[in-house]
């Protein structure tokens, strides 16, 4: 008992404890844990099968069990759990519990022999009505009244109806007890009522002030003892029969029922908590005057001045009476009734008589609530008043007040509160409203919404009023508590906020229970021990667990509160109610302990995580029911094992987990049923798990790491899946909700849930350290983005800890994720096999993302291993390092796609990855990983690789994948990205894909590298910075080195920087990886787009994310991502973004690896630095966190890669020329990202949503085998969607697509830089083929990709596309292309174009590279590498470059083609087929590009474009020719020109179906341009060199030259021009002209910003782009850096708030993110915007690109200028990248934008404003070149003129949708 007492937090803690404990201490311990564990599973606590909900083994929420049926075995279902569960299950509401328990409740008797008291009555209620009798035979408690026993003559020996069968009136019993329950609030039956109230109260108190509860717990024990004694006495009195009322035996846990009594006067009511109430009654400072908070004084004075003293006159008179208290003696006297003091009239009072002034501390209600006081909690003496001109105030008389505080609330009040203003201060007086006879209690109406109160609200009418709404509500709530546990839980969440007030009061009460709480804690700690098992169960339900925690906390608070009342009640009926109360207290204690445990879990996760996880696994393995009981026992047994502190921590984490245990189980089941997409619900958990895994991986040796990597991707994907469609409402949704809630609450609920962990790791650095320690938090995307909320929310420690333990046991020490468990469970052997088989492992790497969770992935022949691989991405990556070191064909298969030649457009796998089927579309919708195939970008992500493989291989059914993707959502997208390429390789293109894998993989790895950037962005950034800056050569070497070389460095990097190595894991194998790596900032991005493009599938996945945000961003990397890439216009920018996305979003898994490499602390530090410096590390986190962030990352990806490299470079690389732009951009972006990241956190959901939207489209791409069919379907859908969305896009849907295309394009540009050659070669054939076959197929695929994306992206495209298919394509391209085929293809095309450009100007480019190489090397060693790779690419082209570049290549190719077709691309986009073709082509036809880098590609593009947009193609071609000719840089320019032309031409072509492709193409085109751009970006990253050479060489050279400086500027530029336009600087020099084009693509531009930024935004903003204004805003916001927000042109309005951009850069970014997220649909249209995004999002790289594109658009206008502009854009892209990260991050986080704001502000003001203007113009915004130019600064204007001309043309041609949509993206 003593223990029970300590345990009991409430006054009735003893009862509670007893009840919870049952009769076994073990049980007690277990119950506390259980109670603590699950928010709404007290029943579960009672039993695994606790009737109420799912059986949560370790459901700590015993309270829920109150409502739930207690388990047969006491230990299994401790009553406390039930008690606590009341809130959720009506723990405290005895009626609820009774109903729930069906009259079987376990409660412990007070006496030492209080075994488990089971309440089983014929009435079916388990509440203690105060008169209960115990059967002498079976010891079951029954209501005396129900059993027909005369209370006056209780038999000495009593047998229940079962032991002594007899006829009983059940109906009468039910009615009687129901009535009692309703009246319980009175106090007699308050046990039940209080049960209701208490849990909530307890919950609130606990949640709100877990600490305070803890503190208060100490006081409670004594109080509890006293209460118990009193209760015992009361109970004796109550029961004439000892049996009926075993004073000691049955403490009525329900005693808390009295709490409701208290509640009635919750504001000023006297709670029946004897101790507390008495203390309050006796201990309050008599107030002779009021105390006013500043807020109240200020508001009152303001109102008084405004209103004069209208109320004063009458109030003054009254107040005069009242004021002179000496003269006025209140005609009332306080009486103690039921332990409550009430105010009775001392004489007969007439109506309107002044009774008394209500004195106390006046404060605004917000202040009161902010302090945690809220009406939801029955605080005794708080009066709420809102009649003073609507001023919500309250008077807190709890510690300072007068007798008026004792006035209770009643449904039939006889007095009211009136205010008077005296001497400028407000006074509240109680006036009678009717005649009040002497001795009548004075009551006032409820001044708070008792209906929302969790606790039982006590009404002073004392049931005199049969219609009492309060009692009705109470009874309803009681019943609802049982039936509406879920609702309650949700409500609990809300109530948590409101409960905070109660919490404070509860805290007061908890003080009493403090000792008890502490005591309870020890048992709880024990239970915490049990927790490991529960943890495993709860792994899947971490979000829920958090919810549960939150709710539980309130419940605990309520319990606490009630316990006081219960004590009073106990005096009357100490037996069962007391016990119940004790149980509640215990539950409360458990909650507290759980919180503690959670805190400890954070600490312990690193150390004990592995241990706990395995246990979790075991427990999970155990049957649910079995597990519940077993776990309880096991935990009990284990308790001793774990240190108490650890236990507490464990308990905390476990409690959290426990909450999820049931949920996790459910989720697992759901996952199994839903093809393991449960992570969606366990999103956060997955994230946590991923983080955990990542940490674990970091801790784990390389192989383990690999395994972890493999696992992580899956977990990560789910995390990304925050916005997956499948489990939108589940974890992700809840988590998002919770996150926002937490943000709103600023950690109040969060405090309870994650606060402790946060407390433990509130400091990002500390958190980082802890996270590092904690495998779960390994990758910091989430932790970073929303370190506090996400981390605690995700409780990566908990979830991942659990998961890791589980996984680790199954696969490896590291693989403990729930998703892993799922995957393991679902495909344990397969995964393991794969895991073990090297080949499979390689595959596995790609598979990891999806495979873990989805048999789908496993369904892939290689998928299984691959599925595991993502988990083992690292291992894969290691294998890749070892086996695929160079460019091993097998595993890299996904990347094999890059082997354009090998993989023909017809290659099903190849085609398939590009567009997952409709199924995949579903994925995309649900998971948006539809781009999964595109996810190759995610290759960087361990999981990505796995996913990629899945996607790539037909075996990985789109459906399966879709499920997986849906389940894994964003995380999966990365995985899918990886998988796509891998799958391709797995399919028929193993060898081919291998190359592609290398290319793709490399990109992916690169992405991973970058991704690690997000996760380890800081690290990667540092490393990359180091690599870029310190080790330009090394980076170059790394990048240039074959994938394996890169992989090694990458691996090391990955290991060191989780991301890089991991990223490479998937694709590092191929030399391209080096390119990717060196492009990590720029190249990585480039490669990523390439590989993604190449893979098409991989890109798609990425695109999914990119489409979403990340998807878009990644999209540029992925096929769809390619759009983003292209859009990024910064292959590097977008590629980076993609990479970043991959790293952060797509490559979340990668991120984890990177995280592992870098301590969380360091990572955080880096991220922080990145944020500060504007690098995109944070964005990575963001992206990881959210698709949009991913999009942000996209730009960040570009930027992130850039940010990582560039961002980190930005940090370090600020000095690096290219990186500097990126760095500047990154810095800006990072800064923005920081904000972005954090914003990303919140935005993440939106982005996720976006992702979901886009994912669906992407999903189609995922369909490997039916790529063409899917593409066809998708394409058509894309067209339809594009049309719709385009229209909508204008409304903001298209932006996504636009973004995507832009993004795709952007990366291709960047990629193009590096990848173009590869792509050129790869793309040429592919493009050709695609042109021929893929045109339909690619187009189709693109369309498909586009389509799904178009859902998000395409719609806008279509919206744009009404007039022009292009938009569809852009949208599609963005969505679809990004998705996969298109995206991939586009990426390829773009890359190809880029490649063409590169190839065409390989030498120029090389020269640029060479000349800029130093800069690049410095800036972007990777970029230099990328360029080198580009140079090499031609050589490597077939292999890695092709792969890497392949996607971009197509992009590039397309762009070159697009150069001419760029407009065509837009045009082509408009005419889906051609672009699609190209897009498709790029996938397989990467070779196509390669061959005709400049011309053929253009032709291909042209053909492609020509097919749909011959005419435009021609002009563009001509232009393209010129521009193209102009390129190296010109290629970009050419591409841009073409693209611009295309865009311009697009106007005409828009109608053509090719739009999707076109869109895609456009994205690609931008890619080409962007490739150039990317090259620029590369220049930035990679194009620094490029800038120098091609840029300079190109007409764009000038621009690009500017870019070079710009580049330097980009990164630097950011810094330098950063202020102006981060991008502008880059663009300024070079971009100016390009910006204008982006303006034309305005939306796209903006989208590009969006794309980048939204490419995340592109995706999100892309649509916005369609919205253009919005998009623009987004773009601008996102990419407003990019003044190219030109996208603002479309989105200008959106973006319009250039100030927004500037100011709102972050804001916008946030908005952007949100918009992007929100606008994801719009973003699709922004595929055109993607360019904008590229420009803007390209981040100014993207924007630049977009802008560039406009220049390109006006290639003729400013061939050189435009081209230079393009380069600037690339620069800008890079910048964008930097900025991109910003924009992208912007969407993701404000960070990039922030940086952008730096540049962006200038850019924004300039760009946004300008762009807004342009945006206003529509795409004229493109012309906004001025705007863009502004963003781009110098070039912007230049561009402005050309672009305007051209843009106008563009506008004219593409105008409708295309221009907006397309232009930004499509044509951008």
Curated annotation (Swiss-Prot):
Polar residues bias (residue ranges): 1049-1068, 1203-1213, 1389-1421, 1451-1463, 1488-1498, 1519-1547, 1585-1603, 1647-1656, 1706-1716, 1806-1816
Glycosylation sites: 435, 440
GO biological process terms on file: epigenetic regulation of gene expression; erythrocyte differentiation; neutrophil activation; neutrophil mediated immunity; positive regulation of DNA-templated transcription; positive regulation of G1/S transition of mitotic cell cycle; retinoic acid receptor signaling pathway
One Pfam match: PHD_5
Keywords, in A-Z order: Cell cycle, Chromatin regulator, Chromosome, Coiled coil, Cytoplasm, Cytoskeleton, Glycoprotein, Growth arrest, Metal-binding, Nucleus, Phosphoprotein, Transcription, Transcription regulation, Ubl conjugation, Zinc, Zinc-finger
Record motif HCFC1-binding motif (HBM), residues: 63-66
Domain SET: 330-447
Family: Belongs to the class V-like SAM-binding methyltransferase superfamily. Histone-lysine methyltransferase family. TRX/MLL subfamily.
Protein name stated in the entry: Inactive histone-lysine N-methyltransferase 2E
């Amino acid at each position: 008992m003593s223990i029970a007492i300590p345990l009991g937090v409430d006054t009735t803690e003893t009862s509670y404890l007893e009840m919870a404990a049952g009769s076994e201490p073990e049980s007690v311990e277990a119950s506390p844990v259980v109670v603590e564990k699950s928010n709404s599973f007290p029943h579960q606590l009672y039993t695994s099968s606790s009737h109420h909900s799912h059986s949560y083994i370790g459901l700590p929420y015993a309270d829920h069990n109150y409502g739930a049926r207690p388990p047969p075995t006491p230990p299994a279902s401790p009553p406390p759990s039930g008690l606590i569960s009341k809130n959720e299950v009506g723990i405290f509401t005895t009626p609820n519990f009774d109903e729930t328990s069906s009259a079987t409740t376990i409660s412990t008797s007070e006496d030492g022999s209080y075994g488990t008291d089971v309440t089983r009555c014929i009435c079916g209620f388990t509440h203690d009505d105060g008169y209960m009798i115990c059967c002498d035979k079976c010891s079951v408690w029954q209501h005396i009244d129900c059993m027909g026993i005369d209370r006056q003559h209780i038999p000495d020996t009593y047998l229940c109806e079962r032991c002594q069968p007899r006829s009983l009136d059940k109906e009468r019993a039910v009615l009687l007890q129901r009535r009692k329950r309703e009246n319980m609030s009175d106090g007699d039956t308050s046990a039940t009522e209080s049960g209701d109230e208490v849990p909530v109260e307890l919950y609130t108190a606990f949640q709100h002030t877990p600490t305070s509860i803890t503190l208060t717990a100490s006081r409670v024990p004594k109080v509890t003892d006293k209460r118990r004694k009193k209760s015992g006495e009361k109970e004796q009195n109550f029961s004439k029969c000892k049996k009926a009322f075993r004073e000691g035996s049955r403490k009525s846990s329900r005693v808390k029922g009295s709490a409701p009594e208290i509640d009635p006067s919750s504001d000023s009511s006297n709670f029946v908590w004897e101790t507390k109430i008495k203390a309050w009654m006796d201990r309050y400072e008599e107030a002779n005057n009021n105390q006013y908070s500043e807020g109240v004084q200020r508001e009152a004075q303001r109102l008084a001045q405004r209103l004069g003293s209208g109320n004063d006159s009458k109030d003054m008179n009254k107040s005069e009476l009242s004021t002179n208290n000496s003269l006025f003696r209140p005609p009332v006297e306080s009486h103690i009734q039921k332990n409550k003091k009430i105010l009775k009239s001392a004489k007969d009072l007439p109506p309107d008589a002044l009774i008394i002034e209500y004195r106390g501390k006046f404060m605004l209600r917000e202040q009161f609530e902010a302090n945690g006081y809220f009406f939801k909690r029955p605080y005794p003496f708080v009066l709420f008043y809102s009649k003073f001109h609507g001023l919500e105030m309250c008077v807190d008389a709890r510690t300072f007040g007068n007798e008026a505080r004792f006035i209770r609330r009643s449904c039939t009040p006889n007095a009211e509160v009136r205010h008077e203003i005296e001497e400028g201060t407000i006074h509240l007086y109680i006036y009678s409203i009717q005649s009040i006879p002497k001795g009548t209690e004075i009551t006032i109406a409820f001044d708070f919404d008792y209906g929302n109160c969790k606790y039982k609200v006590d009404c002073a009418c004392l049931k005199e009023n049969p219609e009492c709404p309060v009692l009705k509500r109470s009874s309803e709530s009681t019943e609802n508590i049982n039936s509406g546990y879920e609702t309650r839980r949700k409500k609990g969440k809300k109530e948590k906020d409101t409960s905070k007030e109660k919490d404070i009061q509860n805290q007061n009460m908890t003080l009493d229970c403090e000792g008890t709480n502490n005591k309870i804690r020890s048992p709880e700690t024990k239970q915490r021990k049990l927790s490991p098992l529960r943890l495993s169960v709860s792994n899947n339900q971490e979000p829920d667990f958090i919810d549960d925690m939150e709710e539980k906390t309130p419940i605990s608070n309520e319990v606490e509160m009630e316990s006081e009342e219960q004590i009073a009640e106990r005096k009357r009926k100490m037996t069962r109610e007391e016990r119940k109360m004790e149980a509640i207290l215990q539950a409360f204690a458990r909650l507290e302990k759980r919180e503690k445990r959670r805190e400890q879990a954070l600490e312990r996760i690193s150390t004990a995580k592995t241990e706990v996880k395995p246990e979790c696994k075991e427990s999970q393995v155990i049957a649910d029911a079995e597990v519940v009981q077993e776990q309880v026992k096991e935990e009990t047994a284990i308790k001793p094992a774990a240190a108490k502190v650890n236990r507490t921590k464990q308990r905390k984490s476990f409690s959290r987990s426990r909450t999820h245990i049931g949920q996790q189980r459910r989720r697992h089941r759901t996952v199994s049923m839903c093809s393991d997409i449960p992570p969606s619900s366990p999103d956060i958990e997955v994230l946590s798990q991923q983080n955990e895994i990542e940490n674990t991986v970091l801790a784990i040796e390389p192989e383990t790491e690999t395994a972890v990597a493999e696992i992580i991707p899956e977990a990560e994907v789910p995390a990304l899946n925050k916005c997956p469609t499948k489990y939108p409402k589940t974890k992700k949704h809840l988590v998002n909700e919770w996150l926002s809630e937490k943000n709103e609450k600023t950690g109040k609920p969060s405090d309870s849930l994650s606060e402790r962990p946060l407390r433990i790791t509130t400091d990002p650095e500390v958190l980082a350290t802890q996270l590092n320690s904690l495998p779960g938090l390994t990758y910091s995307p989430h932790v970073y983005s929303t370190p506090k909320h996400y981390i605690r929310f995700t409780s990566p420690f908990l979830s991942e800890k659990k998961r890791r333990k589980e996984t680790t046991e199954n696969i490896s020490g590291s693989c403990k994720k729930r998703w892993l468990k799922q995957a393991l469970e679902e495909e344990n052997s397969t995964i393991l096999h794969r895991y073990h088989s090297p080949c499979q492992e390689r595959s596995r790497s790609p598979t990891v993302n999806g495979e873990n969770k989805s048999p789908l992935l496993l369904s892939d022949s290689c998928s299984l291993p691959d599925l595991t691989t993502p988990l083992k991405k690292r291992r894969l990556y290691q294998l890749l390092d070892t086996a695929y070191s160079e460019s091993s064909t097998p595993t890299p298969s996904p990347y094999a796609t890059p082997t354009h030649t090998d993989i023909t457009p017809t290659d099903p796998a190849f085609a398939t990855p590009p567009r997952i089927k409709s199924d995949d579309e579903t994925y995309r919708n649900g998971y948006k990983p539809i781009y999964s195939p595109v996810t190759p970008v995610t290759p960087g992500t361990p999981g990505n690789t796995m996913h990629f493989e899945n996607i790539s291989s037909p075996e990985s059914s789109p459906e399966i994948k879709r499920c997986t993707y849906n389940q894994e959502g964003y995380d999966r997208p990365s995985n899918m990205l990886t998988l796509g390429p891998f799958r391709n390789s797995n399919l028929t293109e193993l060898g081919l894909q291998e190359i592609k894998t290398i290319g793709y993989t490399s990109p992916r790895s690169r992405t991973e590298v970058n991704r690690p950037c997000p996760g380890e962005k800081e690290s990667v950034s540092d490393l990359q910075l180091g690599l870029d800056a310190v080790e330009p050569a090394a980076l170059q070497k790394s990048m240039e080195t074959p994938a394996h070389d890169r992989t090694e460095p990458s691996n090391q990097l990955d290991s060191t920087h989780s991301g890089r190595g991991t990223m490479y894991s998937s694709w590092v194998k191929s030399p391209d990886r080096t390119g990717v790596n060196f492009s990590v900032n720029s190249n990585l991005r480039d490669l990523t787009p390439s590989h993604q493009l190449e893979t098409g599938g991989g890109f798609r996945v990425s695109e999914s994310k990119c489409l979403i945000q990340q998807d878009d961003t990644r999209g540029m990397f992925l096929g769809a991502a390619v759009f983003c890439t292209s859009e990024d216009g910064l292959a590097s920018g977008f590629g980076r973004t993609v990479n970043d996305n991959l790293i952060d979003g797509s490559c979340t898994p990668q991120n984890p690896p990177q995280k592992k490499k870098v301590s969380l602390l360091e990572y955080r530090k880096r991220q922080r630095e990145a944020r500060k410096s504007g690098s995109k590390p944070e964005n990575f986190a963001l992206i990881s966190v959210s698709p949009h962030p991913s999009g942000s990352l996209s730009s960040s990806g570009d930027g992130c890669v850039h940010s990582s490299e560039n961002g980190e470079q930005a940090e370090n690389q600020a000095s690096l020329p290219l990186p500097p732009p990126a760095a500047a951009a990154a810095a800006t972006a990072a800064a923005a990202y920081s904000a972005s990241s954090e914003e990303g956190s919140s935005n993440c959901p939106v982005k996720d949503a976006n992702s979901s939207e886009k994912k669906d489209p992407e999903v189609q791409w995922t369909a490997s085998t039916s790529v063409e069919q899917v593409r066809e379907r998708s394409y058509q859908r894309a067209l339809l969607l594009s049309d719709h969305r385009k229209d909508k896009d204008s409304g903001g849907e298209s932006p996504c697509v636009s973004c995507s295309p832009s993004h795709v394009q952007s990366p291709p540009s960047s990629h193009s830089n590096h990848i173009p050659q590869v792509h050129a070669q790869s793309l040429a054939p592919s493009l050709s083929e695609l042109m021929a076959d893929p045109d339909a197929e690619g187009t189709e695929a693109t369309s498909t990709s586009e389509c799904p994306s178009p859902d998000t992206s395409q719609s806008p495209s279509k919206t744009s596309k009404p007039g022009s298919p292009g938009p569809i394509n852009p949208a599609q391209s963005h969505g679809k292309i990004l998705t996969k085929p298109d995206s991939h293809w586009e990426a390829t095309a773009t890359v190809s174009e880029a490649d063409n450009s590169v190839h065409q100007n390989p030498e120029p480019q090389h020269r640029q590279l060479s000349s800029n190489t130093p800069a690049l090397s410095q800036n972007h060693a990777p970029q230099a590498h990328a360029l080198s790779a580009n140079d090499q690419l031609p050589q490597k082209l077939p292999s890695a470059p092709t792969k890497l570049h392949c996607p971009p290549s197509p992009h590039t190719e397309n762009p070159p083609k697009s150069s001419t077709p760029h407009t065509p691309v837009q045009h082509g986009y408009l005419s889906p087929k051609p672009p699609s073709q190209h897009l498709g082509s790029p996938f397989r036809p990467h070779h196509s590009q390669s061959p005709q880098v400049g011309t053929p590609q253009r032709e291909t593009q042209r053909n492609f474009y020509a097919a749909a947009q011959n005419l435009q193609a021609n002009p563009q071609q001509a232009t393209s020719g010129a521009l193209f000719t102009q390129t190296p840089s010109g290629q970009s320019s050419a591409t841009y020109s073409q693209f611009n032309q295309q865009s311009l031409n697009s106007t005409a072509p828009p109608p053509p179906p090719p739009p999707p492709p076109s869109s895609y193409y456009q994205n690609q085109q931008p890619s080409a341009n962007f490739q150039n751009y990317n090259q620029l970006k590369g220049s930035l990253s990679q194009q620094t060199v490029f800038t120098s050479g091609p840029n300079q060489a190109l007409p764009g050279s000038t621009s690009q030259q500017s870019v070079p400086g710009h580049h330097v500027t980009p990164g630097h530029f950011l810094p330098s021009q950063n202020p102006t336009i981060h991008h502008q600087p880059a663009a300024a020099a070079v971009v100016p002209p390009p910006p204008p084009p982006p303006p034309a693509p305005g939306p796209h531009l903006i989208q590009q910003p969006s794309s980048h930024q939204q490419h995340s935004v592109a995706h999100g903003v892309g649509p916005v782009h369609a919205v253009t204004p919005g998009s623009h805003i987004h773009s601008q916001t996102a990419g407003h850096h990019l003044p190219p927000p030109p996208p603002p042109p479309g989105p200008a309005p959106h973006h319009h708030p250039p100030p927004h951009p500037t100011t709102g850069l972050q804001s916008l970014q946030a908005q952007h993110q949100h918009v992007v997220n929100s606008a994801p649909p719009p973003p699709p249209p922004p595929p055109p915007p993607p360019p904008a995004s590229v420009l803007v999002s390209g981040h100014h790289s993207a924007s630049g690109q977009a802008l560039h594109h406009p220049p390109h658009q006006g290639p003729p206008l400013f061939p050189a200028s435009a081209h230079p502009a393009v380069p600037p854009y690339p620069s800008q892209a890079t910048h964008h990248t930097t900025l991109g990260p910003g924009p992208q991050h912007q969407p993701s986080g404000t960070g990039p934008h922030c940086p952008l704001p730096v540049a962006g502000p200038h850019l924004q003001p300039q760009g946004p404003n300008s762009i807004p203007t342009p945006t206003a113009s529509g795409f004229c915004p493109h012309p906004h070149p001025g705007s863009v130019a502004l963003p781009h600064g110098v070039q912007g204007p230049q561009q402005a003129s050309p672009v305007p001309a051209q843009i106008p043309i563009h506008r004219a041609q593409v105008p409708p949708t295309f221009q907006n949509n397309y232009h930004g993206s499509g044509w951008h």
